[in-house]
Amino acid sequence: MRYHQYYPVDIVNGPGTRCTLFVSGCVHECPGCYNKSTWRLNSGQPFTKEMEDKIIADLNDTRIHRQGISLSGGDPLHPQNVPDILALVQRIHAECPGKDIWVWTGYKLDELNAAQMQVVDLINVLVDGKFVQDLKDPALIWRGSSNQVVHHLR
């Protein structure tokens, strides 16, 4: 997996103070997407064990209380990203108790395959659906267009 940006402290992409990772790779290519630079799978930089360790350390850093992590992109549920995203969320569950995990994807919840559902089974919130320019609404919270759904899973 590759990623474009990691924010160790973020107050924009989800509730509370959190970490945010923007991964590379998106097949949806939504017109009007605010993050087009993340579409190509080979863009950005490699997601390494060192970066994964940094995320875990940041989530456990007691100097700044972080509520959890937001995974966006690109698309964390792109088939090529799923193995690394699954490993990351499993590790967060094991090593960062009490931290919530939010994932944004262009796929719809009812369209996900078994591998993608393994990730969804471990997260707290899934924001699903492609961004639709004609349905854009700046008043929406945690989503860009009114067709997208915020699923509070656990």
From Swiss-Prot:
Cofactor(s) this protein cannot do without: [4Fe-4S] cluster
Pfam family, any one: Fer4_12
Family matches, as Gene3D superfamilies: Aldolase class I
Subcellular location(s) per record: Cytoplasm
Cofactor, free-text remark: Binds 1 [4Fe-4S] cluster. The cluster is coordinated with 3 cysteines and an exchangeable S-adenosyl-L-methionine.
Entry EC no(s): 1.97.1.-
Subunit structure: Forms a tetramer composed of two NrdD and two NrdG subunits.
Entry GO terms, CC: cytoplasm
Binding site for [4Fe-4S] cluster: C26, C30, C33
Catalysed conversion reaction: glycyl-[protein] + reduced [flavodoxin] + S-adenosyl-L-methionine = glycin-2-yl radical-[protein] + semiquinone [flavodoxin] + 5'-deoxyadenosine + L-methionine + H(+)
A GO molecular-function descriptor: 4 iron, 4 sulfur cluster binding
Alphabetic keyword roster: 4Fe-4S, Cytoplasm, Iron, Iron-sulfur, Metal-binding, Oxidoreductase, S-adenosyl-L-methionine
UniProt-listed NCBIfam families: NrdG, PRK11121.1
InterPro entries reported for this sequence: Aldolase_TIM (IPR013785), NrdG (IPR012837), Organic_radical-activating (IPR034457), Radical_activat_CS (IPR001989)
Function: Activation of anaerobic ribonucleoside-triphosphate reductase under anaerobic conditions by generation of an organic free radical, using S-adenosylmethionine and reduced flavodoxin as cosubstrates to produce 5'-deoxy-adenosine.
Top enzyme category: oxidoreductase
Name of the protein in its database record: Anaerobic ribonucleoside-triphosphate reductase-activating protein
Binding site for S-adenosyl-L-methionine: G32, C33, Y34, G74
